[in-house]
Amino acid sequence: MEDMDTTITLIGTRLAKEGVEFFFDGDTPECEQCKLKNTCMSLEKGKKYRVVKVRNNTLHECFVHDKGAMVVDVVKAPIFALLDSKKAIEGSKIRYQAPKCDEKLDAETYELCYPKGLRNGERCTVLKVMGTVEMEADPSITLKKVELLP
């Protein structure tokens, strides 16, 4: 994943460490008055990112982050999800469709059925197929746990 497109942005100093992953939630009213707003808002709202490089140790004043912000390079981070086994082929490009999951799920399985940062119809690449998950309510449905890159 080293050849992925990087984006330069600002992030709170507490998160400005290589390998840290986060979801970008968009701007706040405090951002309106900031001269660096356009750099911060270069990310896509609701998407998951990973810090791949801290550019320098220059601390920038930030109205949102109490300890300031730093310049970092980020890439979109993979998302773990459940996928119909017929679509779970490593390297394939798909349009994500959330599977029909049992109503009574444990928290981990629920998060895989309805992953944050991924919308139905969104294009993504299946990076890795990690195993089979069977739904108790309907044994005919076979799902695979996969790593997807939107």
UniProtKB/Swiss-Prot annotation:
One Pfam family matching this protein: UPF0179
Source species, domain of life: Archaea
Family in the record: Belongs to the UPF0179 family.
PANTHER family assigned to the protein according to its UniProt record, in alphabetical order: UPF0179 PROTEIN MJ1627
Record-given protein name: UPF0179 protein Mbur_1033
Organism: Methanococcoides burtonii (strain DSM 6242 / NBRC 107633 / OCM 468 / ACE-M)
